[in-house]
A protein has these predicted regions:
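Conserved lysine of the Walker
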Residues: 20
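Conserved phosphate-donor/acceptor-positioning beta-strand/loop module used by diverse small-molecule
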Residues: 100-105, 114-138, 170
Length: 204
């Protein structure tokens, strides 16, 4: 019996230094597969890249038109080029039962939750302010000024944790990843995502 439940969009956030990249890598190591969305960009196509696979390559004028038409769930400008995630990309994958994960900054996460109210939001929280400081300083790339900026920004972002559905403290990477996997598995079996399967079973 080939039955598919409704997919979901996962918003994955946390302050700089909370270890969210490491946690995400660990989740993938455990065999969790996420659907990849194809972003739109105005940068030039590089050798070996395929339009529609690596990116959707468009002109600046086309990109700005998409902004005007409210087609993006989020977009940014970096080094003179625009990058954005289309709402239609997420909707298409979720409708086919996929699990789309967007690792995104706190500010962007707020916009995504407004656009997709069924999105599952997870915030990775450091175990203490001291641990956060040590992780930021441990990178060895921070000047005193840049550290202060990143640390104060992180504190402001941590204050936004109540806006998320789930908050997971990253005191141990393996345990944190297991907790996130548990959240994802539980969310997959919520009635709103199982309804199609249930209806199909009942109507056979």
């Amino acid at each position: 019996m080939d039955l598919k439940n409704k997919g979901m969009l996962v918003v994955f956030s946390g302050p700089s230094g909370c270890g969210k990249d490491t946690v995400l890598d660990k989740i993938k190591e455990k065999g969790y597969v996420f659907d990849k969305t194809v972003s739109v960009t105005t940068r030039a196509m590089r050798d070996g890249e395929i339009n529609g696979v690596d990116y959707y390559f468009v002109s600046k004028e086309e990109f700005l038109e998409k902004i005007k038409n409210n087609e993006f769930v989020e977009y940014t400008e970096y080094s003179g080029n625009y990058y954005g995630t289309l709402k239609s990309e997420i909707e298409n994958r979720v409708s086919k039962g996929g699990c789309v994960l967007l690792k995104i900054e706190v500010e962007g996460a707020e916009n995504i939750k407004k656009a997709f109210n069924e999105a599952v939001s997870i915030f990775i929280f450091p175990p203490s302010k001291e641990a956060l400081k040590n992780r930021l300083l441990g990178r060895g790339t921070e000047t005193e000024e840049s550290f202060n900026i990143r640390y104060n920004t992180a504190l402001k972002e941590m204050a936004k944790a109540p806006q998320y559905d789930y908050v997971v403290i990253n005191d141990n990477v393996d345990l944190c990843a297991e907790t996130v996997c548990g959240i994802l598995n539980a969310e997959k079996t919520k009635y709103l995502r199982m309804q199609t399967i249930i209806d199909e079973i009942l109507n056979k």
